[in-house]
Amino acid sequence: MSNFTEIINTYLESYSTYNNGMVEFECKYGSLTFYKPTHPLIIVHSIYILPEYRQRGVCRNILQHLIDSTPKMFKRVRVQTVLSKILYEYLLRFEYKNKKFRLSMYGFDCLL
């Protein structure tokens, strides 16, 4: 999980240096792709966890770390592309520190 934590920290700390569009990171556990829009919003375009690391709470840890570390200038975290039925159902029931993801026409949004 530490690799995903490092990826998230790197993205958030260097947010202003990235061009708008896709920002992709890979690590030994899988990959995390962000989409940087023109307005202040953290968009997770995709979360891919390698099969051997699934069902170990990695996705939960990623979402919790995003909620805990996203600077206050951002009003929400959005998980945009949900192709997996497992992730879709997980986001519907996810709750952390009284924060939940709500399905919108743009993806799953969590107000910070």
For each feature predicted by the language model, list its residue ranges:
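Short, low-complexity Ser/Thr-rich regulatory SLiMs
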Residues: 34-38
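Conserved active-site alpha-helix within GNAT-family acetyltransferase domains
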Residues: 82-103
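Glycine-rich phosphate/pyrophosphate-binding loop shared by adenosine-nucleotide-utilizing enzymes
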Residues: 27-32, 42
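Short amphipathic alpha-helix that is part of the acyltransferase structural core
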Residues: 1-22
